[in-house]
Amino acid sequence: MKPRVLGMILAGGQGSRLAPLTQKRSKPSVPFGSKYRIIDFAINNFMNSGVFSIYVLTQYKAQSLTEHIQRGWRFGTFLSDYFITLVPAQMYRYEELGAVWYRGTADAVYQNMHLIDNFDADYVAIFSGDHIYKMNVEHMLEKHIESRADVTIAAYPMPRSQAHQFGVMQVDAGWRVTEFLEKVPDPPGLPENPDLSLTSMGNYIFSRRALEELLHTSISGQEDGFDFGHNVIPRALADGYHVQAYDFHRNPIPGQSNPNLYWRDVGTIDAYYEANMDLISINPEFDIYNPSWPLRTSSEFSPPAKFVHESDGRKGQAFNSVMAGGVIISGATVRDSVLGRNIRAHSYALIESCVLFDDVEVGRHSHLNRAIVDKNVKIPPGTKIGVDHDHDRERGFTVTESGVVVVPKSYTF
């Protein structure tokens, strides 16, 4: 008999390091890759793996995410085990703390244990909703069952110099976790390669009994916060539970011959920008065109993209770029960029190495370079963005260490 698997996506993250993109939306609802939202990748991973019973746990500025899920991710009403349901924080009342919002990743699940009980799950897959990657969850579940683990953690080998931002595991020869350290300044390396650390991707598969026991035993005394990395996983190891690491690099994706190596946290503006730029190469490391692993999202019913004018010096053209429907390139040039829906670029404008969200208008003779422009921005003719960073800062734009300029949503020039 096929096991009952419940998917839970943690989508309440504030994403403060992604400001100003997260000033009016949560991190999982930030647009990505022309037509998607960041959360779409977690949902697609579940659906492409045959997990169709999904709760999305939301909290911070969830309106944009709520509208996206309700508009684009709906099943019919006749299949009770096929659902994608939003679960907002509801001020759970603790005896010691009173009514509180979600106080961390584990607390979000703890406050909704009744959903797991009502579904009668055998296994619970708890995944982060704010990373860019493909993952065959079914294969991870198979390994979880084969190893007879209580909890399996998706693991990503990463250079030690970068691993301090993540939870880090030490494992034995069979990849059973022997130690878990959450965001330590000097993370340990792998025995076979000291320059690499085994980091947690924030994705877990729990056997239901172990999840219920661990949440109830590890919450005691956690008044400031309650997280899987800080509290639950260390408690599981201390109490002798079988905690297994799952090698993400061995995760098979249908239709993909090369190893599955791509996973991005996109927790900063620079990381987010680079992940978008990863899509535009001839043979991108992260391929969104694999028909055996479709990436679905909300349909907007936009008309096709259009390129007009071809006289000398005034050609509507684009090179090495990705763009959604409704785009009109009217005598402008676009290079190495990712464009959202319903963008209008007027004659003689030059857009280079940019990420433009939906409903942006670029005036004549404007020049945009290494910029992220949020939704509903009308750029006047002759405007330069990303060319003079001092002037960009004077206008209140964010300029990152690498020189990426961010124009906030609905900015008025």
Swiss-Prot record:
InterPro entries: ADP-Glc_PPase, ADP_Glu_pyroP_CS, GlgC_bac, GlmU/GlgC-like_hexapep, NTP_transferase_dom, Nucleotide-diphossugar_trans, Trimer_LpxA-like_sf. Involved in the biosynthesis of ADP-glucose, a building block required for the elongation reactions to produce glycogen. Catalyzes the reaction between ATP and alpha-D-glucose 1-phosphate (G1P) to produce pyrophosphate and ADP-Glc. SUPFAM superfamilies: Nucleotide-diphospho-sugar transferases, Trimeric LpxA-like enzymes. One of its GO terms (molecular function) is ATP binding. The keyword Membrane does not apply. This is Glucose-1-phosphate adenylyltransferase. Homotetramer. It comes from Deinococcus deserti (strain DSM 17065 / CIP 109153 / LMG 22923 / VCD115). Pfam families: Hexapep_GlmU, NTP_transferase. Pathway: Glycan biosynthesis; glycogen biosynthesis. It catalyses: alpha-D-glucose 1-phosphate + ATP + H(+) = ADP-alpha-D-glucose + diphosphate. Belongs to the bacterial/plant glucose-1-phosphate adenylyltransferase family.
